[in-house]
Amino acid sequence: MNGTEGNNFYIPMSNRTGLVRSPYEYTQYYLADPWQFKALAFYMFFLICFGLPINVLTLLVTAQHKKLRQPLNYILVNLAFAGTIMAFFGFTVTFYCSINGYMALGPTGCAIEGFFATLGGQVALWSLVVLAIERYIVVCKPMGSFKFSSNHAMAGIAFTWVMASSCAVPPLFGWSRYIPEGMQTSCGPDYYTLNPEFNNESYVLYMFSCHFCVPVTTIFFTYGSLVCTVKAAAAQQQESESTQKAEREVTRMVILMVLGFLVAWVPYASFAAWIFFNRGAAFSAQAMAIPAFFSKASALFNPIIYVLLNKQFRSCMLNTLFCGKSPLGDDESSSVSTSKTEVSSVSPA
């Protein structure tokens, strides 16, 4: 056995040397050098300083500008709210614990941090799924002439919270549990042990199949169909330069969206699956911490991809930041209307 299981924790190191100590009571500098904990704290501070303001600004700008409160934008606001939860309740705890070198808030604090980090991450993940489905419905029109309304948008948001809760809540009530992971300064579901008391095995199988495989399949299908539809429409209007430009923009955005999703979740899910199917195998605390870096970074690059690259949101943000006077003048506003025209022309009639 290459790990040590204790009361609500698992350390990826054998206790034959007698070095292993509870991550709730003692610094974990035997797992990694102190500077690595400080580097992790700096990384979390970076995400807090940049991720939290971008997500909060998205919420503020949407509240200030009525034209942003359109049904197709609701899910972007939900995505920003999820990022805010991750940054405020998750990143701040990891920052504090990394500075101290151990899970300084104890088992209860670990469970709370693990819950909010998982909830925010899952809301963000399912928001990307709903966003992909919404765009698929609007552009590909699988249901014919379908009017996307506020009720549909709110149903999509409710769906993200139901799915996220079905993943984040069970460990609080005995189906799996939240324990320190990586360098023992942040918490997540228990992938590491086969403790029958918590039915970890069934929970991990459920989480991997329902909360990773299903989203990946859905995103690849919907965005793949969207690109094919846009390319087919552009091929029928080859004489239109605006249509060709819109097709290229849509393709680039889809590639960015899919890559962003894969970068955020594939490393974490893959390593967690490897741990699950190789119980007792040797791995370092840093090896588990690195994939978590990518999933946490989604709170920063999701709003960049989905909000800051959205011309309408970007224009309103600049107006808000510069007190109603965008430094880009009228160009940005005009590009918004142009973008709308291009997208509608690419969409099949």
From Swiss-Prot:
It holds the Pfam family 7tm_1. Phosphorylated on some or all of the serine and threonine residues present in the C-terminal region. This is Green-sensitive opsin-2. It is a multi-pass membrane protein. The modification N6-(retinylidene)lysine is found at residue 296. The gene is opn1mw2. It comes from the Eukaryota. GO terms for molecular function: G protein-coupled photoreceptor activity. Residues 328-349 are annotated as: Disordered. Its main location: membrane. Residues 334-349 have a biased composition (Low complexity). Residues 62-73, 134-152, 231-252, 310-349 are cytoplasmic. The chain crosses the membrane at residues 37-61, 74-99, 114-133, 153-176, 203-230, 253-276, 285-309. Keywords: Chromophore, Disulfide bond, G-protein coupled receptor, Glycoprotein, Membrane, Phosphoprotein, Photoreceptor protein, Receptor, Retinal protein, Sensory transduction, Transducer, Transmembrane, Transmembrane helix, Vision. It comes from Danio rerio (Zebrafish). GO terms for biological process: cellular response to light stimulus; G protein-coupled receptor signaling pathway; phototransduction; visual perception. Residues 1-36, 100-113, 177-202, 277-284 are extracellular. InterPro entries: GPCR_opsins, GPCR_Rhodpsn, GPCR_Rhodpsn_7TM, Opsin, Retinal_BS, Rhodopsin, Rhodopsin_N.
